[in-house]
């Protein structure tokens, strides 16, 4: 993202504007409705509540599809940002399951005129529900 506005560009979130635990920015995945209450798996094995606004190398989100379609898993890596704030996770399984590596969760990024912000992401979409141990092994293998 290059700022061609002719003035500073302030990139923030509802949390940087004062709303707690609402730091959704960047690439935002809204999971299927059927995944409400799905399992969140992360590096170091924190619970989903412990992940909100925190840094982790990777997270996985698993859920069952409606009726007879089985389940699936999304493995997401935090990625990188050329800006100073560390990428933090905006993640929840209820009331709406979502997953977002957030570059400005609780700290605004100020992009000066002519400056660029570079973000990298890696997401892996898997066709079944993966257990924590096997997902950790895959994350180790695929880590960028």
Predicted regions and their residues:
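Active-site/ligand-binding surface loops and adjacent short beta/alpha elements
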Residues: 8-83
